[in-house]
Amino acid sequence: MAKHYLLYGSERYALAILRPVQEAIRARGGEAAWFFDGPGAEDLHPDEKLLTTTEEVRRWNAIAVTTGSKAVPHFFPGVKVETFHGFDAGKPRHIYIRGFFDLYCTTGPRDTAQFKAIADKVGHFSVVETGWPKIDPFMQEIAGDLPPVRQPPVILYHSTFSPSWSAAETLYEEVKRLSRIGEWKWIVTFHPKMSQDTVAKFRALENEHLRFADDDNILELFPQVDMMCSDTSSALNEFLLTYKPVVTFKNRRPGPQLLDIDDPAQFAGATRTALS
């Protein structure tokens, strides 16, 4: 009898994170089903199994529940596994034990060391450094040399939703001004929890030079652009894997891999520098 697994999502981005896990489960002869407590179920493929009630989950009787979310229902059958929903961007509570999980599948050595140190103290969960499943198919796609910069260049503008770290409102007027000039093309996308007022403001900027994207998998946008502008979003760490430049506004953890600015007046100049 095939082993059952449950993939648990609370946002649409769970699909991009957990589909590689589903592929691995199927390759080993197992069966995966999905359960959502938020958006995402509507984007499942015909060959993907959806459970919609806790009774169905109990009958499925998974040996493991895997999620990128920070919490999971403790009464679902199976070992609880967290794969994370992004790289560490330097925000508070990235390393935070909530008592939901039996296993943390960490993305790299830094997280592994910190989680193992806690595991040694509390003793109620395990840690295995697995890498991040969302990146697996993407790394195969970006192999090879960087393509030349488009003319005009295309910029991906992405912001986190956290009010303390988001630069969306601060840079709105500059994005508005620059998107009307035509020097560059823009694709704008936000974290799904971004304020709907902010989303509406940027969506209203759409014109021949700017497109607002609702893609649930931001990785699909990376091949379409030449650089990223962001703030303290974990998505910029994903983008850096492409070796394309990133301009940030008041990043919490700046470094030589970023062109970090602290004044909207520097935005256009930093963007030109990144593209040069």
Predicted regions and their residues:
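Active-site and donor-binding regions of nucleotide-sugar-utilizing enzymes
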Residues: 6-141
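Nucleotide-activated donor-dependent transferases that construct or modify glycoconjugates
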Residues: 1-11, 156-157
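Catalytic binding pocket for nucleotide-activated donors in carbohydrate/polymer assembly enzymes
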Residues: 121-129, 205, 234-276
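Conserved acidic residues
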Residues: 61-63, 78, 102, 153, ...
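A donor-sugar binding/catalytic signature common to diverse glycosyltransferases
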Residues: 75-84, 215-258
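Catalytic donor nucleotide-activated moiety binding site of glycosyltransferases and closely related
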Residues: 31-46, 181-214
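Conserved catalytic-core segment of nucleotide-activated headgroup transferases in glycan assembly
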Residues: 13-28, 134-202, 272
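Hydrophobic/aromatic beta-strand patches that form the interior of the parallel beta-sheet core
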Residues: 33, 65, 81-82, 103-105, ...
